Amino acid sequence: LTWIIVLLSIGTLLWAFVSGTVIGGQSAGRWVRIFGLSFQPSAFALIAMVMFAARYLEKYSRDTAKMLSWKRLALDLWGPVLLMFVLITPHNLSTGLIFIFTFYVILLIGRYPLRHIFISWAIFAAAGLCLYGAYKANPEAFKETRVPTWVARVDNFFVKSDGKMSQEDMDKYRQVTAAKTAIALGGTFPAAGPGKSIQKYFLSQADSDFIFSILVEEYSIVGGAFILLLFVVFTIRVTVQAFRVEDLFGLLVLCGLLCVIMCQAIIHTGVNVGMIPVTGQNLPFISSGG
């Protein structure tokens, strides 16, 4: 069953990679439409990866020799996972990072050998540095990719802008400013009240990427703190239930899905308060379509 889910995931990712559509003004084609329904294949891939990795580790948990067989690693674990990662990342770097981070969390909980994890970390870090260096050395070679967007967002976050931002990143900068303004307004009493936000008219993704700041503006900083508290309670409850599960597969699936949800929540709130560069992550359970 996990192989069927993974193959379906790879198929939809290929579809989005080749002919993905744009929804809500986002520049990256992350969506596909099937029978009139639109969805992001990357979200489906996160679930597929969690189940796939959990099944592999559960299957070979008592036989380390088979688990570390190069043939099995290439065909039954790393190959499909890396293929999904490569298909996700060009259109959605933040989801790609959540994908690979969650994968490593599952490996750690599943007692995958640390030596292999550290080696793969080193390879990923080296690849990232090489990509960054290659872009800085020859930006024109990456003009038709999203690499300039990624680098610009990181550079503009850590270094004061030199006025050379693209139109897309200027829009993102304005949205972050509006989000911070909404949070600042929400820090005062009384708050704007339900449905009475002003900054939502300046945020093109007010109901998704910046919903947290709008909620703070409408329900005050207390409302924002309550939302964060709900996620903390959710984390504690799922963690307790995960370690009550008797089989390794169930434990890894619960921990993996929890990791995905909490990564999205942390990144979303971090972007809204200006702590991390702009991404396109929704607030789980709350954002429109989240």
Regions found by a protein language model. Give the residues of each.
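Hydrophobic alpha-helical transmembrane segments of multi-pass inner membrane proteins, especially
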Residues: L1-D171, S213-V271
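Transmembrane helix boundary and interhelical junction motifs in multipass membrane proteins
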Residues: N92-I98, A191-G195, A206-S208, P277-T279, ...
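Re-entrant/interfacial helical elements at transmembrane boundaries that shape
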Residues: F99, G195-Q199, L230, N272-N282
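Short hydrophobic, aromatic-rich alpha-helical segments embedded in or entering the lipid bilayer
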Residues: A152, R174-A178, A206-F210
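Extracytosolic (periplasmic/ER-lumenal) interhelical loops and adjacent juxtamembrane/interface segments
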Residues: D171-P190
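Long extracytoplasmic/lumenal interhelical loops at the membrane interface
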Residues: A184-V222
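A juxtamembrane structural motif centered on a specific transmembrane helix
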Residues: Q264-G290
